[in-house]
Amino acid sequence: MPLVRFEVRNEVGLGDPDLYGGGGGGGGGGGGGGVGAAAKKGGEAEPKALLEGVAVAGLVGILRQLGDLAEFAADVFHDLHEQVITTSARGRKVLTRVQNIEAALPSLEKAVKNQKSHIHFTYVPGSDWHAQLKDEQNHLLSSDLPRFMMDSYEECRDPPRLYLLDKFDNAGAGACSRRHSDPSYFKKAWDMMRADKTGNFQREKKSQKIKRKGSRLREPYHGQTTPRQRNGELQRALTAVQLTSRHFATPSTDGRSLSENRSTSDVRSNPDNISRSSSFSSKARLSFTEQVLDTKPTVVPHENGHDKLSNNNLHKLSNTPLHTRLNGTSADDLGDDLKQSSLLDDMTARSPSVKWDEKAEITMSTTSVYCDDVVMDKAEHVQSKCISPEQQEIDHREMETLEQQEALHQKAKQLLVSSGLNHHDEVPSETDNYVDALNTLESETETEPELQTKSRVKPVPSLNVDVPQVELIDNIVTESPDSSVAEFPDAYQNSSMPPAPESAADFPSLSSADAPDISEPVLSGYTANPHPEVSAIATNTPVSNTEDAPGPLEISESASRAYIITLPNQSLPDSKEIPDSKAEDAPIDSPEKLEPGPSSYTPTIPIKESSIVSQNTNAENVSGDCSEGTACAISYSQHIISDKPTNEVSATNSSPDDTSSDEDTVESGGIVEVSNSQPMPLNDSLENGCATQGLPANAPTNSTGVSSVKLWTNAGLFGLEPSKPPVFGAHDGPKEDTTPGHTQPQLCHSTGCPEVHFSKPTESAQVYVPNGNSPITSSFVGKLVGICPGSTSHSSETNQSTVRTPDTVIGQTEGSTGCSTSFEHSDHKNIIGKQTSISELLESEDSAENGAEMFSKTDMTGRNNMNQVSASSFSSIAQRFLANTLQRRTPKYTDLPMSSVIVNTDANGTDESTQISSLAPNETTFEASQFEKKTENDTNGLPKSSLFSSSHYSEKSSPPLEYMKISFHPMSAFEMSKLDLDFSDENLHENADDMMLPTFQLLPGSSVPQLGSGSESEDDTFGRSYSYSSYDDLSPRLYSNSELWDQEDANGLEDHDMHNNPNQIGSFGAPISSFVEFEQMDLSGAKSTVSLTDLGDDNGLGTLDSHPAGELPNFDTLMAHQNEAFIPHNPVSLSPDEGQLPPPPPLPPMQWRTMRQVASVEEGRGSAAKEDMLESTSDLPPVHTPVQEEHLLPIAPPDQQNLLPIAPPDQQGHAKENDRKVDGVKEISNPLDIEIRASLLQQIRDKSGQQKLNGHEKSKAVGNDTKNLDEREELLQQIRSKTFNLRRTNASKTNTSSPTTANSSVVAILEKANAIRQAVASDEGGDDDSWSDI
């Protein structure tokens, strides 16, 4: 680089100039020194010196740069060296692992190859494949931690130098390090700290509990106790268990008897709390408390040698507490002695031997059953749970004091039992017997929402209660927060205690009691029960003195439990007859003497809330026996049946010689269905307004398990239909097999929804709705819940599912008739159910009181997928709506559909006649029963008349859409079949989808006529198709006069009995399935008279296919199913005296498809001209062309073609056709129809030519059919009020009915129809003067 531009200085000269100069002068000689001095003086450096300085400076700079570069290179190569070393080490480790794998792999391969089956490798962990091999880890992974983790260890500081403290420790060297590195040291320290905290917490909790109880006494209206409160009451439990020990833990309904829930220490600390309780009078409470507190400690062992142990879930409240009232008195009306005894029993049940940790989880024993506050403990698997270490630190002095107090309570209880229970009417003071009704109602109202959040409890064990014993009353008396009241007649005929109408006993779950006659072997037998199964109690309560105690039996079924207890008045026919006196004297609760006869118990589990209260005021009609129809519904929860996967519930319905009835179980998913009860005697049922029709008085009633229907409803707001369709839980659980002649049923196995059974309620019974104020009569309850008095017989025959008829049981075999425990047994597991609505039940109830008597007989065989539907699954909204609706008693509501079970239809005509209720268009179902009078059946089992009442369509002037049929006929009937707007009667409500949304489609129908078609139906006018395709033949739902739909009285339909039509529906108040025979139409165009008894398993009729509720079957699926189901099994019923089928006539023009408006004008024409036309046309066969034969005959299936041969028409008079019967059903013939048919024949003869007609209709087929399709909405509206019945004129008949006038919408449609008729007439040249419509 050029150095000229820079000032280059002498590096050496930068030093001291003098020194440098002096040194230079000395070194260079005198001459040189002179020159240098001269140059310095001159200010100019010598050039040579400058060059030397520049060279030295550059060399120094280069050397400095090289030194920096070398230092940087050293750093780089050092890092590279480290990476190389690390990579080499890892490579060596990988090589080592590979060698280890190569050594271990052969053994693994050998172990795998030795396996014979390799499918289990998918389900079995790999470690189990070769469990015998050595478990070596890290074959594929390095055992070293990652570097970032190792760095954290390397960077951390060294462990504390605890070894420095060893010289101060007596343990020697390493003691300190070992002590502080031992985990047990920290565990011990933690336990000590926790124990201190727990002790403080217990003391604080106890004080808070006392304060809380005091405030709860001051607040008379409190709800269910919280789990924290209940756990706080478990500080002192007992050390052992007895089977029948009962501990009453729940406070009273309105918080007035709190002493049951308080320990004795709490009583001592705050005796004023006891004085506030309504259980004692003031003096009795204080004196009793003082007597208890002034005693000395003693320990009283239990009679079986064990100290009592309060169960872990002693205070775990059930979902639905229930109060049982004796003879019309509520639980709050109890005398002081009764409640005092309950207090004593409660205080005696507590023992301070165990102190409970409040924070510990309280688990539930699988062998104990908790029904509200009654705890029945089994001795097996009894152990103390959740005992914390501090439980052992209880003060011994306090334990002795509490035990001594409990002993005194036991003694005092015995004194009270002997003195007080025999004098129910004696009360210490007047105020103690006072019941604040307002407080009770308010407390029930406030605690109602808490029913949804109650804790899960255990069901009831299989124990029987011996009601006549005195100790029973003492043991079962308690009060429950938000319980309903169930009333039982007094049942103390043979006991030392006289009947006390004002005394009450609380049956929270009808638990077993310490009856004195229960011996120790019986208790030990219960204790030895190895199965922790949940059993349902059968409370055998022989009842007498019903005249003295006409108290109603009220059941208010709470959130999610429902038990049914029926109290029959006599023993079973199939069981050993036991007189009432002996039955009452017998120790019913012992397993050796179990009787299904005197009483029965039906546990049922609804899914949603249902309030069913039946009140029997006719108890005075039956002296010495249980009032008929008394039923007790005990609420029960579905999800608490059992802890086992298949919940097992046992109901003690067994024969007298059956000793294992307490362990009979039924596997169900929440269903227990056992109901054996006796119906009323014949005379009593007549007094109650029930039509018995010769039913034996001892005919039992049984209720089988059904699946409930989950109802979605908008509570009938604004008159709308339900917002969501019902969800049908159709389950196919096997039914029970009942041994013939044996009274112990093997209960059904089902996972379906529960049911509610009532056994013969009377008209005077009342129903109390939770949120309503209006009682409902029990006849409505019977229909609401599906009360079907009678016996559902069990049948061993295939495809036979029977329901008891008035005087016989169909399909019942081997003498099981009358066995109240005989259940319906069918190979098809299910019974046909029906769906109805509340308004229909209310309407039909009114007509039932008019004396309409009918019975239900099931000709339908068992269906695989048909479930009974229960009315117990109402939501809370539905209940409120039900209460409000029933208050108004308006029979016009059709908004809230519900399900009614059709199980046993007995002689209770007053109640059962209302089960045949009318259905809304979206509620129509197949009802598998025909309602008939047995003495009036004809040869085909058809009743001569069935009069029903209370039309569901009383507000409408037209039949529902399901009862109508619209036929769309193309103009060219030779090339295509007619189209019917059909509701698929073959599949009518055999699917849950049809129940949800009845759909209609345009169904292609054949034009092949049947049996002397002549002109028998309206189809003769529209297409000359088969004569029996009209809906007048299917069922007489279509009448020409729409005023029939406005009739609400059953007597108004007697005028139509002249037609002698068994299928006539009075006010159309019954579903179409109530007819015995269904005339079906399939795709072949043939009418099928289907009897329910002719249907097989594969038929679609009555089968409720369990698709999902949201899936609506399409048209193809329905029709395919209909063809497969009905064509092979529904042959056409042919009369032997009728001739073969005539060829079909040609399709008439559109001008003949006139409306009813024209009929009123042309009706007045002379009948003489029409008679002449009839005479001239009756001998001529209808016109038939090969073209029509070619297109219409192949439509019929092969099996129907054999039944529909083409033959010459019947040449006899048409009067014979009008009077003939189809399978015993006489066809209704309208005189106007006959006249129109005659005119129709005349018009057909006057046609110029068949080919011309065919050509015109062929050219206009598409256009007219499309037009009809576009107008179907108007036609549907018209057909709701009008019916097309074009028939042939009959000279022997006179016009007895006048057509109704059409409304404005119909007039508009008629004008369009007339325009079409005129257009067709102008083309065809035909005359329509001789045509009219009906």
Curated annotation (Swiss-Prot):
Residues 197-281, 294-331, 481-516, 568-602, 643-668, 791-832, 931-956, 1000-1026, 1248-1268, 1280-1304 are annotated as: Disordered. Keywords: Actin-binding, Cytoplasm, Cytoskeleton. Coiled coil: none annotated. Its main location: cytoplasm. Residues 241-256, 320-330, 791-823 have a biased composition (Polar residues). GO terms for cellular component: cytoplasm; cytoskeleton. Residues 197-207, 574-595, 1248-1260 have a biased composition (Basic and acidic residues). GO terms for biological process: actin cytoskeleton organization; positive regulation of Arp2/3 complex-mediated actin nucleation. It is found in: Cytoplasm, Cytoskeleton. Residues 310-319, 945-956, 1289-1304 have a biased composition (Low complexity). It comes from the Eukaryota. Residues 1271-1289 form the WH2 domain. One of its GO terms (molecular function) is protein kinase A regulatory subunit binding. Involved in regulation of actin and microtubule organization. Part of a WAVE complex that activates the Arp2/3 complex. Belongs to the SCAR/WAVE family. This is SCAR-like protein 2. It comes from Oryza sativa subsp. japonica.
